[in-house]
Amino acid sequence: NWRKILGKIAKVAAGLLGSMLAGYQV
């Protein structure tokens, strides 16, 4: 199911982006 895979990738990418932004703000 490519949709499930894309959702998982999007979730991981969002998590990485969020942690990166949080790191820059500190």
Curated annotation (Swiss-Prot):
**Compartments where located:** Secreted
Secreted found in the keyword field: yes
Q: In which tissues is it expressed?
A: Expressed by the skin glands.
Q: Does the keyword Secreted apply?
A: yes
Which domain of life, per UniProt? Eukaryota
A GO cellular component annotation here is:
extracellular region
Q: Name one GO biological process term.
A: defense response to bacterium
Q: Which keywords does this Swiss-Prot/TrEMBL entry list?
A: Antibiotic, Antimicrobial, Cytolysis, Secreted
| Functional description taken from the UniProt entry | Thanks to its amphiphilic alpha-helice(s), it may integrate into membrane phospholipids, leading to lysis of the membrane. Has no substantial hemolytic activity. Has antibacterial activity with a broad spectrum against various species of bacteria including both Gram-positive and Gram-negative groups.
What protein family is recorded? Belongs to the grammistin family. Group 3 subfamily.
What is annotated about its quaternary structure and interactions?
Exists as aggregates of 3-4 molecules.
- What protein does this entry describe? Grammistin Gs C
> Which species?
Grammistes sexlineatus (Goldenstriped soapfish)
